[in-house]
């Protein structure tokens, strides 16, 4: 509602059908894991940095107007980028509860933009047998919960699906462009969505490029490892400068 009332969605259309599916199919999501190999081991100094505000740095605009058959849009609404920056500034200066509220607000907007069609529905019925007999071609499964009543899952005969995947497309395109540029100039050993591992030379290069700091979209130093072992896309462990052992496992 905040984004709507501030004009972020002016001239932004929800779409459906083949064009919407084509846009969703073209989305390139962030990758996690060591670069160019399955495992990575190092006993040199490794810097682990992550991006302030994560994906919010890449929320710059929402494509506007009616798309052509290739999913291309005639315009862009840049208001959302300004609003996100304002929300980020408020979030940094406010209490933790408000900060979490703002984070959930922005994440829900992102999630809605890439939601998938809901082809099934589950509903409770008083007389399951009667419903199943009448609509058997659409019934996927059912279970009795008490007496003759129970839960029935059916396939929807008509699936209405409207969303604005062009928003997710714009965010991910900005993300991929940003990290492609970073990796073209800095040695990256491991990436984890909005974070990466680089060596001392790479970290100093990020500083020279003005990419380390407290602003949204800048990297902040999270850890310095004297030894690190990346075991898979989701697991790594390392030893920090103070001797602390860090074990990381993504769920």
Regions found by a protein language model. Give the residues of each.
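Conserved acidic
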Residues: 1-251
């Amino acid at each position: 509602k905040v984004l709507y009332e501030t004009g972020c969605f002016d001239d932004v259309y929800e779409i459906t059908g083949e064009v919407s599916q084509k846009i969703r199919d073209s989305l390139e999501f962030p990758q996690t894991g060591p670069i160019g190999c399955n495992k990575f081991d190092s006993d040199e100094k490794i810097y682990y940095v992550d991006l302030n505000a994560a994906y919010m740095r890449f929320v710059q605009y929402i494509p506007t107007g009616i798309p052509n058959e290739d999913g291309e849009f005639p315009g862009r609404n840049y208001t959302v980028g300004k609003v996100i920056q304002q929300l980020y500034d408020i979030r940094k200066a406010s209490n933790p509860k408000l900060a979490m509220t703002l984070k959930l607000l922005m994440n829900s907007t992102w999630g809605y933009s890439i939601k998938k069609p809901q082809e099934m529905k589950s509903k409770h019925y008083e007389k399951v047998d009667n419903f199943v007999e009448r609509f058997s071609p659409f019934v996927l499964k059912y279970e009795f919960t008490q007496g003759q009543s129970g839960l029935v899952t059916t396939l929807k005969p008509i699936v209405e699906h409207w969303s604005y995947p062009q928003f997710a497309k714009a965010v991910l395109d900005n993300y991929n462009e940003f990290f492609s540029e970073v990796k073209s100039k800095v040695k990256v050993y491991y990436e984890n969505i909005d974070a990466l591992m680089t060596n001392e030379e790479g970290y100093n290069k990020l500083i020279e490029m003005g990419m380390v700091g407290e602003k949204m979209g800048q990297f902040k130093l999270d850890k310095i490892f004297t030894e690190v072992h990346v075991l898979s896309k989701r697991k790594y462990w390392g030893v920090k400068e103070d001797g602390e052992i860090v074990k990381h496992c993504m769920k």
